[in-house]
Amino acid sequence: MWGRLWPLLFSFLTVTAVPGPSLRRPSRELDATPRLTISYEELSQIRHFKGQTQNYSTLLLEEASERLLVGARGALFSLSARDIRDRTHKEIHWEASPEMQSKCHQKGKNNQTECFNHVRFLQRLNATHFYACGTHAFQPLCAAIDAETFILPTSFEEGKEKCPYDPARGFTGLIIDGGLYTATRYEFRSIPDIRRSRHPHSLRTEEAPMHWLNDAEFVFSVLVRESKTSAVGDDDKIYFFFMEREEGSSSFTQSRSSHRVARVARVCKGDLGGKKILQKKWTSFLKARLICHIPQYETLRGVCSLNADTSSHTHFYAVFTLTTQWKTLEASAICRYDLAEIQAVFTGPFMEYQDGARRWGRYEGGVPEPRPGSCITDSLRSRGYNSSQDLPSLVLDFVKLHPLMARPVVPTRGRPLLLKRNVRYTHLTGTHVSTPAGPTYDLLFLGTADGWIHKAVVLGSGMHIIEEIQVFREPQSVDNLVISPMQHSLYVGAASGVLQFPLSSCSRYQSCYDCILARDPYCGWDSSIHACMVATTVANRTELIQDIERGNRGCEGSRDAGPPPPLKTRSVLRGDDVLLPCDQPSNLARALWLLNGSKSLSDGQDGYRVGVDGLLVTDTQLEHSGNYGCYAEENGLRMLLASYSLTVRPATPAPAPQAPATPGAQLAHDMRMFYVVAIAILGGLCLILASSLLYVACLKGGRRGRRRKYSLGRAGRAGGSAVQLQTVSGQCPGEEDEGDDGEGTGGLESGCLQIIPGEGAPAPPPPPPPPPPAELTNGLVALPSRLRRMNGNSYVLLRQSNNGVPAGPCSFAEELSRILEKRKHTQLVEQLDESSV
């Protein structure tokens, strides 16, 4: 049942967890739209670094030496913090040997991603050395590296107690007063633990009778100097943020016997472990639930701390991803937690594991003294408890069985600062920014899973996203973020390399209104030079105009609202469509169009279509003519962006009158017309004459065709076959005469032609006959006396027999002899068909 109702409950909580009315932004939801969107092509002053490797996820900034140390796969880099592109950088190659990679692959690990030396830890060890640890193909190693020479030492330390085996596992670590505090999954079995090494008293968490950590994935750790301002002599504490699996929850989701929850844990820096109980184990370990928005669907992705050196002002920002069990909706939430709230939870009631019910429940019994999990204070020292080894066994037994607190840690004001839909944040970092007016604001940079950076300022109970920046051309996850206030730069670590770009781009804002609407704590309008400047670069900061809280005050009396846009003219015919372009500079601005300075135009009104790219006027009429102004309305301010003068013409204008032609041009025109008319008349006469001749020819040809008759015969001769073509003027031998004449001799002169193939040599060619007359008595041109090849292997000679002059026999014999000579070896068909004629 709960599985079906969770999507509805998720939507309900999303709507109901909405802040009240606010002057800064709409209150209908927690989602915030970035004011500006800056694509990769629009970026300026961005710097890239990429070596011959990948996975540049470990970053360490050394402000004093102006160096940025980078840990990658099989390499370490020392870059200039001023410009990471500086070619004078140093590099250490720290690869796993082929033998180690082979052993890793034999253990079933991926030799394409896992069986390498991924540098996961990089911290300052002392004044002269750094300390680095790498997975080293599932055999972790650590090394102390000289900061000056930046050369890999010849000796290494075993890292199985300090570094994860798996490069994909969560890891966090700190070096505090020479001691190494790390939290990850250790050993090849991937056991989650919080450990202290390189210390006279090495410590770890308890595993029996119950695990203090259950399938934990660690995200972040930080040292809070609580001893500086403590009135009771309290100890410094290390806080760890992680996700773990909760078994047997007693919440209203009892049907879900196991789910992952966010936790915060803490240990005391001066913890030495127990003397008999909890030997080499933490005696100050406590953990509590961390809640942001919807507990059952929260995954902790990143945490950053601000003012960790002053515990009274220390607070944390955590980013969660909210995902339903079907992953039909994805969002990210940002919550703020005050250190005072966390301290109050750790001094509250405890939980205990109830074996009968197999779940955690609130502990209702008595709590021994000194309070379990507390650090050694001046009060305890006065009572003889100078260290954790002096604590009573009853206290240590209680700590062993009650590591979990009953109350959860809730965000400041009980709700998230931001709920961003369709975005998955992966990392965040923040800094304090003081403004010329005096207030200090928290500025956050949030990295996404697809390579974008969101820059946001915290304003009371909400957040204003100043801009979203696409820092990678190809989508990839942002793995690490580091801020350098001295260099005014943000460093981004990702799989493909390291990026550096400025914390602000104030020069992008061209007017006073645009500068204050951005609400960037780094930017202010300087009226003396009429420019939006970085506040830290201005000598007299008090003269800068800023309004971070509301973002709409300060420019009323200024003349720096920007020059008015030029007036553009448009002229169209009546009934046509016309587009008046107008791009809004801000995602938060609303387009407003005014006609003749007063009439407000709305979408769908009188043929107007208001879009994000301008105003479309459809089916223009005469009343659409006028002056159009495009304004951007944002946060109560109105700015003119474009101005147009539109004229609608009633009809197509008449063509302009032509100038009178000159006498010479008129004469040339008349001659051309005369030639055209003459050619047309002659063409018509030729057509009539040709038609008459064709008609006469057809009549005569029809009468002559009816008086002729051809017959195809066959003569049998020894050794071959013959083709005979007979006209009405003679007959072929061996057949009856079907014509009007009874005479015939069987020769060529008788009107019958026989073609007999054979091997006989042709007679020598006689002298050429006189040419035939050009025209016969019937007026038709004489038929050619030439041999024509028909279908098959037979040849015929077409000629007239009556009332004509036959072609000379010598000419025919000569041509026939030549053709037959070429084909005498060709087999002729014995049976002829009619298609051979």
UniProtKB/Swiss-Prot annotation:
Signal peptide (UniProt feature, chain positions): 1-17
Record field: transmembrane: 674-694
Broad class of the protein's primary localization: membrane
Annotated GO MF terms: semaphorin receptor binding
GO biological process, one term: nervous system development
Membrane topology, from the record: Single-pass type I membrane protein
Regions of compositional bias (Pro residues) in chain numbering: 762-774
Keyword Ubl conjugation: no
Composition-biased stretches (Acidic residues): 734-743
Residues carrying sugar: N55, N111, N126, N386, N540, N596
Keywords: Cell membrane, Developmental protein, Differentiation, Disulfide bond, Glycoprotein, Immunoglobulin domain, Membrane, Neurogenesis, Phosphoprotein, Signal, Transmembrane, Transmembrane helix
Cytoplasmic side: 695-837
Disulfide bond entries: C104-C115, C133-C142, C268-C375, C292-C335, C506-C523, C515-C532, C582-C630
Similarity comment text for this entry: Belongs to the semaphorin family.
Quaternary assembly: Interacts with PLXNB2.
Name of the protein in its database record: Semaphorin-4G
